Amino acid sequence: SFQLAAAHRLARDLIDAAKRIGEVPDPMWLDVEKRLPLYTADYSGIMLFKGQRFVESHRHHSHMAGLYPFDTIDFSDPKTLRTVEMTYRNWTRMGMGLWSGWCVPWASIPHTHIGNAPAAVFMLHAWDTFFTNPGYGSRHDVYNQGLSIMRRGTNSGRFTVAGDAPGEEIMQMDGMCA
């Protein structure tokens, strides 16, 4: 569904650009908008691609690219709205246990798009609490346990306390930029 959303965003932008400069849009761009589906979906919501359901909430939310960043999904259609609702419910049900740091602020955006401001704000606070180090640097691995298992030292099954996992040191080398 990511590629479908990207193709639609590109086609729409090319059509719009052509009109703005007084050109006729390429028929291929119009054909993409006419015949290419916006996404693939089943009863569970938007799928990763045709035949592949979203079965594990991991480090990216690309199956929802039609919501963000491409903004190609129109909520005014009741069937589409139901699909988005099922997608959101399924994504929420899967949880954040396999998420990495950079996808947490990204998750704030779909919450914003559907009007769930408290969840959007929570994601930003969660990112700050669990995925930034004491110097406020963003991390891939969780800095504090309890939200995700994406942590060096714990993914191998060894439970660690804060500061105990390998690679948790904070250092700066002269001449190196952050």
Model-predicted segments: where are they?
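Active-site core of glycosidic bond-cleaving carbohydrate-active enzymes
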Residues: F2-C177
